[in-house]
Amino acid sequence: MSHLNIANLGEDFVAQWLQSTGWMILNRQFSCRWGEIDIIAQHTRNNQESILAFVEVKTRSPGNWDDGGRGAITLKKQAKIERTARIFLAKYPDKAEYICRFDVAIVSYQIISKQDHELSITQESVTSSSVGEYKFQLQEYIPAAFECLID
């Protein structure tokens, strides 16, 4: 399976996890000339205050070289995500008053054997999922992972 397909499966997994925790997915792979945001999600608190999360998903196999994807969230990448978020808010001005934050989801995946796949179905939790021959696990979800400069 290609890197792009693995990345998309990782994003699918995180979107499902967010929905299971009360978030509504507003957009997936929102892109403009500045970059792309993997997931844009909204959560409304009990007091009706809405949070808008711009989520960067990093899906990595064991033994990767960039600390599970954390090393790929450079200042340059953060600036691209922020510029893309500004474009999203300009396109959807009704969301501009929401509390905005930039989250990062670290997902690991591995190829599983048929025997392991059968076991994972019965032991699966909300933070792990199997798709075909791959098992995905949410290693870490970092809310407000980097500074939000959106007004």
UniProtKB/Swiss-Prot annotation:
Molecular function via GO: nucleic acid binding
Record Gene3D superfamilies: 3.40.1350.10
A Pfam family it matches: UPF0102
InterPro entries for this protein: Restrct_endonuc-II-like, tRNA_endonuc-like_dom_sf, UPF0102_YraN-like
Coiled-coil annotated spans: none
Classification via HAMAP family: UPF0102
Family named by the database record: Belongs to the UPF0102 family.
Entries under NCBIfam families matching the protein: YraN family protein
Protein name as it appears in the record: UPF0102 protein Ava_4800
